[in-house]
């Protein structure tokens, strides 16, 4: 294969990595597996343009993107729209997609796995056409992200500290809003404190990531209006890996979820793969696109695929 690797030097672990040494390691692993590879190390503000240029080239067989969860989400969106196979190097805090794909979380180990891996047809979700590889969420999560962004942090530990402060803030000020939804034709109106729509159902890990990205469904989760004690209980359930079995969570499975906010009298936000995004129209159309994202994974991945 002819591969282009694009690494976000501003993303997570890469900020403190010798990127020249790392690039040499990646090149050695891919050439040892019989592939041609080009490597670009760019800043965060150059990532999207570099990804789009690479995915538009007719001479490449795959790209590899490295960075935090935001970088991986952006790369997945570009790769999906162009049909380009994508490998990922997890350099972020959570690395949720890498966990779903059972890739090593060590940036020095994953290149060899990808170089000797195979391509699978995975699912990807979209919110009004914008790709998400992990989840779309509103309510508790969106408020926590908004609170966290109001705190300054410059390191992984700083981000964790800011997240903890934000979570405490949300416990004492939980949201409560009304939604109407249509999930594969099932229509309801509910008051909720939280909504989450995931690309495939969450597994049972504390970090709430899908254990399989090939089942072809969205996971649709809602929580009723919660008091501070209720938010604390839900947080405890999540920490125990019991989110899906929590008595506070209603779970559905769907191919399509349409959301409407009948009392949208102020600015509301959602979170798409960790990024806070404003909702302007009062409606959101969520879809799953089964098998439309081609991903480079390890050779021992249980999903059927072809060796590269």
Q: Where does each model-flagged region fall?
A:
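Short, high-confidence coil segments that cap the C-terminus of an alpha-helix
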Residues: 59-60, 119, 254
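Gly/Ser/Thr-rich active-site loops/lids in small-molecule metabolic enzymes
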Residues: 152-161, 206, 210-230
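N-terminal glycine-rich "phosphate-gripper" loop used for MgATP/nucleotide binding
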Residues: 65-70
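ATP/NTP phosphate-donor binding region
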Residues: 1-62, 73, 308
């Amino acid at each position: 294969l002819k591969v282009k690797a694009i690494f976000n030097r501003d993303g997570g672990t890469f900020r403190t990595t010798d990127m020249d040494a790392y690039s040499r390691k990646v090149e050695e692993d891919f050439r040892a597996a019989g592939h041609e590879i080009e490597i670009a190390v760019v800043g965060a503000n150059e990532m999207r343009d570099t990804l789009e240029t690479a995915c538009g080239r007719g001479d490449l067989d795959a790209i590899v993107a490295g960075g935090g969860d935001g970088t991986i989400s952006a790369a997945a969106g570009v790769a999906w729209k162009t049909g380009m196979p994508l490998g990922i190097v997890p350099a972020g805090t959570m690395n949720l997609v890498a966990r779903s794909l059972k890739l090593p979380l060590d940036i020095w180990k994953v290149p060899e796995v990808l170089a000797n891996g195979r391509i699978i047809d995975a699912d990807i979700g979209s919110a009004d056409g914008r790709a998400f590889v992990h989840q779309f969420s509103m309510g508790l999560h969106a408020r926590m992200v908004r609170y966290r962004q109001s705190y300054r942090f410059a390191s992984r530990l700083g981000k964790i500290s800011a997240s903890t402060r934000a979570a405490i803030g949300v416990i004492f000020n939980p949201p409560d809003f009304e939604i109407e939804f249509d999930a594969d034709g099932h229509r309801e109106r509910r008051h909720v404190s939280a909504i989450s729509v995931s690309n495939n159902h969450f597994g049972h890990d504390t970090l709430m990531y899908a254990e399989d990205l090939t089942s072809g469904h969205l996971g649709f989760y809602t929580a009723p209006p919660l008091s501070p004690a209720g938010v604390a209980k839900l947080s405890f359930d999540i920490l125990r890996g019991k989110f899906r079995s929590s008595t506070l969570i209603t779970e559905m499975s769907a191919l399509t979820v349409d959301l409407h906010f009948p009392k949208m009298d102020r600015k509301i936000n959602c979170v798409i793969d960790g990024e806070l995004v404003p909702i302007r129209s009062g409606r959101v159309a969520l879809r799953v696109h089964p098998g439309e994202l081609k991903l480079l994974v390890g050779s021992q991945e249980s999903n059927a695929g072809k060796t590269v």
